[in-house]
Amino acid sequence: FVQSALSQCLGRVDRRIIGGCGLEAPFAWDGALGWDGLRGWDAPYGCGLAAPAIDFSPTSGGALPVSSASAIAPVGLAVASENVYEGILAAAGELPFVGTVGVEGILPTAGAGAVHHSCGNGLNEMASRDAAFVPRFADAYGIGLGAYGLEVPVLGAPALGYRAGWKGCGCGL
């Protein structure tokens, strides 16, 4: 049995900007200066290593904790089972995530079947951004200039899951 999940950190917003709006991540680690996530080099963006594992609780058996940090966006995450998976998934931020459900096979002639998919309080949106070959957009893949177009050089090696730089997404210098 193998479990894995990949994710990509595009940076966190400075809590001083959005703190009064109630948009702070409830599971973020508060650093000495109140930043979300582990602090990079005096930057309000963390690398996400302090995020707690998300607990998927199946109806029988133990929990399926998943915790991940990666510089490469996932192409898919699949769970296949003949059982019912229930539980709560808490996610904060803008994630490259699309959920789909497929029902295959022979269904019982008696009983009921249901597929329920929701996104918490309904405050969600589909966001699509092109990673054009412009320095300010290329940094999400560990190359180019600083995050959010700050025009500061960064270091990146996506295959190694390492990202550093001033105001970047890494556990910077």
From Swiss-Prot:
Signal peptide (residue range): 1-7
UniProt-listed Pfam families: Chorion_1 (PF01723)
Gene Ontology terms, MF aspect: structural constituent of egg chorion
S-adenosyl-L-methionine among keywords: no
Entry keyword annotation includes Repeat: yes
GO cellular component: egg chorion
General function of this protein: This protein is one of many from the eggshell of the gypsy moth.
Name of protein: Chorion class B protein Ld32
Protein source organism: Lymantria dispar (Gypsy moth)
